[in-house]
């Protein structure tokens, strides 16, 4: 009986560890580390002037249709292999985790991600400069 209880405890602990590892690997933070940190850095400060900070004023991006469209189409977002739901969670996590301004924004949706994936961005620096020129 003791062996059975011990074996059950060991198996339960192993399954718990495996499931928590699987959850961790699908978290928005994990996706950020895989697909965004190379350009935007661990703390979201980016590599100005070419790669913008995620900590600075993103209001022009999260607050306008053109800006949201831009965020949905940047190479790291459009190229992320996760589901549309996971990518929407990633974008929302980025805004909530790094942006230091007003967080009154409409969360990104999986439907927006799917639309963004239909139109890949070929020159993100050029498109960002064009977008900023309009503000």
PLM ranges: what are they?
Residues 7-17:
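Bacterial N-terminal signal peptides
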Residues 16-31, 42, 47:
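Electrostatic cytochrome c docking/interface patches
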Residues 32-42, 90:
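The canonical Cys-X-X-Cys-His
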Residues 85, 96-135:
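Flexible coil segments in periplasmic/lumen-exposed cytochrome c-class electron-transfer proteins
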Residues 40-43, 58, 74-78, 94-98, ...:
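Sec/Tat-exported extracytoplasmic proteins
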Residues 29, 45-80:
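Gly/Gly-Pro-rich "capping" loops immediately C-terminal to redox-active cysteine motifs
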Residues 1-4:
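Positively charged n-region of N-terminal signal peptides that target proteins for export
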Residues 65-105:
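Mid-chain, structured segments of secreted extracytoplasmic proteins
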């Amino acid at each position: 009986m003791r062996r059975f209880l011990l074996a059950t405890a060991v198996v339960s602990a192993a399954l718990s560890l495996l499931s928590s590892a699987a959850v961790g690997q699908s978290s928005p933070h994990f996706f950020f580390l895989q697909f965004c940190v190379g350009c935007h850095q661990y703390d979201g400060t980016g590599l100005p002037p070419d790669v913008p900070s995620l900590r600075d004023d993103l209001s022009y991006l999260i607050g306008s249709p053109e800006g949201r469209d831009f965020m949905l189409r940047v190479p790291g977002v459009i190229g992320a292999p996760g589901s549309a739901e996971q990518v929407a969670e990633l974008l929302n996590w980025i805004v909530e985790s790094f942006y230091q301004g007003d967080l009154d924004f409409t969360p990104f949706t999986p439907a927006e991600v799917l639309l963004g994936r239909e139109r890949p961005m070929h020159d993100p620096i050029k498109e960002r400069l064009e977008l900023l020129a309009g503000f």
